[in-house]
Design a protein with these regions (language model features):
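Ordered hydrophobic segments in well-structured contexts
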Residues: 40, 74, 129-132, 181-183, ...
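A subset of signal/propeptide-processing and intrinsically disordered low-complexity segments
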Residues: 59, 79, 137-139, 185
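A short, structural micro-pattern
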Residues: 67, 124, 149, 197-199
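Catalytic core of Fe(II)/2-oxoglutarate
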Residues: 159-234
Length: 234
């Protein structure tokens, strides 16, 4: 078996122990100490409209050193094609994250931009990207940081049957076929395999609410998502 096949087969059916989760956990504990791989966020959207905009976009190859068939385009960022972390780019690597020239790009995605500005509970955006994985495409096992934190938003816009995001020792993230939002701890080793005949479209959001102050709306969404996991173990 290949590295990817071994990782998927060994971890896709794992479950994580939630038997000791406190029912009264607050936002700070959930995102920094719970050790959960993900928490669902229940945020409505016109998912077919977002999916249509994602499908029509022009994509740029992304991290081809550890993937195949993975591409991306920025909705908000330095430009449409600057899909990686700003420190990868020589001209920006010495800047602080606050000084990177992030802005809405000229991608033709009017509804997605409207939804992000009017409905998603962030006030400041860094990179916001459509991500595509072609049929048979994959992202090899990797981590995005060493410190635990639920800090990346991963949205399944179109997640065809047979496409999995698998987390080491914690199983498969339960994306709906279309339209589901998760706060994701990307410090855990994880991998993607699109074992389907359709393109897989996701959106990944990096940003924060209220200029580093966590809004009550966002706190409530995270706590509600966390509590939705509790019935699984009671």
């Amino acid at each position: 078996m290949t590295e990817l096949e071994t990782f998927i087969s060994s971890n896709s059916k794992c479950t994580f122990d939630t038997s000791q989760l406190p029912a009264d956990a607050d936002y700070e504990w959930i995102v920094t100490e719970s050790n959960l791989p993900y928490v669902p966020l229940y945020i409505p959207a016109q998912w077919p409209m977002i999916c249509g905009e994602a499908q029509r976009a022009t994509y740029y190859e992304h991290r081809d050193n550890n993937s195949n068939g993975w591409s991306s385009v920025c909705i908000h960022g330095i430009s449409q094609s600057h899909t990686d972390h700003y420190e990868v780019y020589t001209e920006y690597r010495d800047l602080s994250s606050r000084n990177v020239p992030y802005n809405w790009t000229d991608i033709d995605a009017p509804y997605t931009k409207f939804w992000l500005q009017e409905y998603f509970p962030y006030d400041v955006y860094h990179r916001v990207r459509f991500m595509k994985v072609k049929p048979g495409g994959y992202i090899l096992p990797h981590t995005d940081g060493n410190q635990y934190s639920l800090n990346a938003v991963n949205i399944g816009i179109w997640n065809p049957n047979g496409c999995k995001l698998v987390v080491k020792d914690r199983g498969t993230v339960p994306f709906n076929h279309t339209g589901s939002v998760f706060l994701f701890a990307n410090n855990f080793e994880h991998a993607v395999f699109n074992d389907s005949e359709q393109d897989r479209y996701h959106m990944i959001i990096h940003g924060y609410p209220d200029d580093y102050r966590i809004s009550e709306r966002f706190r409530k969404l995270v706590v509600e998502g966390y509590r939705s996991l509790l019935p699984r173990i009671h």
